[in-house]
Amino acid sequence: MNLYLREKVIIVTGGASGIGESICKKLAEEGAIPCILDKSKKNMERIADEITQQYGINAFLVFTELTDIHSCKSAIDSILLKFGRIEGLVNNAGINDGVSLEDGNYEKFIASLNKNVGHYFTIANYVLPALKASRGTIVNICSKTAITGQGKTSGYAAANGERLALTKEWSIELIPFGINVNAVIVAECWTPQYASWISQQANPEEELKKITSKIPLGNRMTTPEEIANTVVFLLSVNSKSISGQFFFVDGGYVFLDRRIS
């Protein structure tokens, strides 16, 4: 299937590792130009080298502190200065920081919202004029915690609920401009962040086996590449009639949150 993404300029926040990295590589495979917004210069440079070697595409790298609105604006300005256009945005960056109701406080909760959803709005706000010009696309990466809860993670769960709400809201607000907006919901996906969490468990191997045994399709973790495949389709012209939708790429996991059942 031709996704018609060649030479399309696509922003990926948090594109220097995990799911974001896989999205950038899949975009490059389709001939698109990934613009990586991240604060890990080392990882960005590594990924850019790999993309050039594998696909002959030069990714555009912008060191960005996503919790700083000035850094966000500067990043978008630099992309527009370089290319003069933007066809797509993937809001992806975030971290499950464990801010709970019992052990957290107001300041920690607001900080969690800022780092996990504030930049979804900020980046989209700065990119909007370019997306209006290109009749582009937004894809918001979200966590299943917004749907199922998890426990001990009020900040992250609330932020992801907001990501889903923004997906619905923007899909309506942006209808006049031909911009479609969708969300991809991630559950148990094997990323460096997830691997770090597993390693902190009392018995990592046993915990991982317990989780995967409750994932219906294949009893295995979702891969970042599987998330990327869905995201890249949603960025393509083949999905322009789809908007305001939530796509669960999770091996059927969220139908019943089996890890806590």
Residue ranges and their predicted role:
Residues 100-113, 211:
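Substrate-binding pocket helix/loop in short-chain dehydrogenase/reductase
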Residues 1, 148, 232, 243-261:
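Short C-terminal tail/terminal secondary-structure segment
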Residues 143:
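Residue(s) in the substrate-gating loop at a strand-loop-helix junction
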Residues 90, 175, 180, 242-244:
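Short, small/polar-rich loop/turn modules that mediate ligand/substrate recognition or access, typified
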Residues 124, 159, 167:
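Active-site helix of classical SDR
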Residues 9, 16-17:
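Conserved glycine-rich cofactor-binding loop
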Residues 129, 172-176, 240:
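Alpha-helical segment proximal to the catalytic Tyr-Lys
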